[in-house]
Every structure is written in C-alpha cells, then in structure tokens.
C-alpha cells in the first residue's frame, strides 16, 4: 500500500470513530422530549405524553399526577376533541445532574368538550435521566392570560 492511501484510510477510521463517539447534548435531548410532549398533546395521545413523564410526576404541587394528565388526554380523545400546543422559546438550565426547562405554551382546542381558548401558560419543568432518556418529574404552570 502506498503511504498516502494508508494515511487516507487512517483518517477515515479516525473520522468514523469520532462520529461514533459523538453524544447528543442533554439540553438537546430535553428539548426533543418537550417537543415530543407537545406533539403528543396535538395528537391527543395520552400514552405518548405519559412516556415523557416519570411515574412519580408531580404537577403543580400535587394537583395533577402522570395518571391524571393521561386520563385528561384520554377523555379528550374519547370525546373527539382536538388540542393544539404551541411552544414559546425554551430555556434550559442545568442543576447538578438534573435540568430545569422554562417556556410558555399556548393551548387551544376544537371546542367540543374543552373551551376553544384554554390559555397561555408559563411552565417550569424539572427533568432527570431515566436510563437513556430524559423524563419530566415535576412541573408547575400558571395561566398568563
């Protein structure tokens, strides 16, 4: 083998190794989980939304559990309701091995069972790693308008 060909092969192997070692940053994974939760809401898919929450999820200081949120979406689905969640900018901050994400969300519905204008909410979510995934273990929200 010619030295230039060997050098080229070495560069290819090193480049492939570097790509294989690349790990998606936690902030990106959390942002993707938030987007997936919004999509699950748009699709009125209770199981897809619950998948993003931990079993011990605490919503608004005990007001809603993971099961409560799932039941709300199931009820909306059974009644043929449409939901829409439009996210505002998401700000993610590390807190040790966990993260806090703050954002606004505008919720609307088709108006069959729920009011058409559900409101604009300021949301703070807390995230922790669960295996390879990031799951929300707590959230607080306040209606803005």
Task: Go through the PLM ranges and name each one.
Residues 1-9:
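Bacterial N-terminal signal peptides that target proteins for export
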Residues 17-20:
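C-terminal motif of bacterial Sec signal peptides marking the signal peptidase cleavage site
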Residues 43-56, 60:
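Short, well-ordered alpha-helical segments enriched in acidic and aromatic residues
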């Amino acid at each position: 083998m010619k030295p230039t060909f060997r050098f080229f092969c070495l560069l290819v192997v090193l480049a492939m190794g570097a790509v294989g070692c690349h790990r998606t940053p936690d902030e990106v994974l959390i942002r993707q989980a938030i987007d997936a939760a919004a999509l699950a809401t748009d699709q009125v898919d209770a199981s897809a939304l619950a998948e993003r929450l931990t079993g011990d999820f605490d919503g608004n200081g005990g007001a809603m559990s993971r099961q409560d949120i799932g039941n709300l979406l199931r009820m909306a689905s059974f009644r043929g309701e449409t939901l829409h969640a439009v996210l505002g900018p998401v700000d993610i901050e590390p807190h040790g091995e966990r993260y806090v994400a703050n954002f606004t969300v505008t919720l609307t519905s088709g108006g069959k069972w729920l009011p058409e204008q559900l409101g604009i909410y300021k949301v703070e979510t807390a995230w922790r790693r669960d295996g390879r995934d990031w799951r929300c273990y707590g959230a607080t929200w306040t209606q803005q308008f």
